[in-house]
């Protein structure tokens, strides 16, 4: 999931670069104000994505799996610890998905304001954020079969679907504002 977070962070960084370019579609006070708002939000998304790279949940899972299993009570404690560690490990890709989805929403806002000359960077940024989202989603979906709590799995699957819809809409909005990428 670290690679997905790095991809999303790179996409956010590119968008941030575009947001602070001196040339815009319409050099108005309103546009400049909106660009500052978008840049501030992108900076936050980028930093949060970088923080997820440093989140290490594997240690908790390894520790839980190495707990003693001699008695029924120990096996029960071990299973509970494993499930708790799995939830913690599922939260990281879910957060990467949320942040990449937010980055894509900001890309759509930025696409309406940025200069046409930045469209190549915008397309690449959108692709990187989409790759980050897809990588985190794949990582998370691979973990779902390990959960015992069906209601938790259902809530995660519902959030995956919601974020996927949000991401698709934001990517389409950005692409429609940018036009077809150069061949």
Which residue stretches match the model-derived regions?
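C-terminal auxiliary extensions adjacent to catalytic cores
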Residues: 136-147, 154-183
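A structural-propensity feature for long, helix-poor, extended segments
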Residues: 25-68
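Inter-helical turn/loop segments and adjacent helix faces that build the functional surface
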Residues: 22-25, 29, 110-119, 143-155
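Amphipathic alpha-helical interface segments
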Residues: 56-127, 131, 143
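Long, C-terminal-biased catalytic regions of enzyme "large/alpha" subunits
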Residues: 36-41, 61, 127, 134, ...
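Amphipathic alpha-helix face/heptad-repeat signature
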Residues: 6-10, 38, 45-52, 85, ...
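Conserved phosphate/anionic-ligand binding catalytic regions in large, soluble enzymes, centered on
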Residues: 2-16, 118-136
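Disorder-to-helix initiation segments
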Residues: 3, 27-38, 75-82, 149, ...
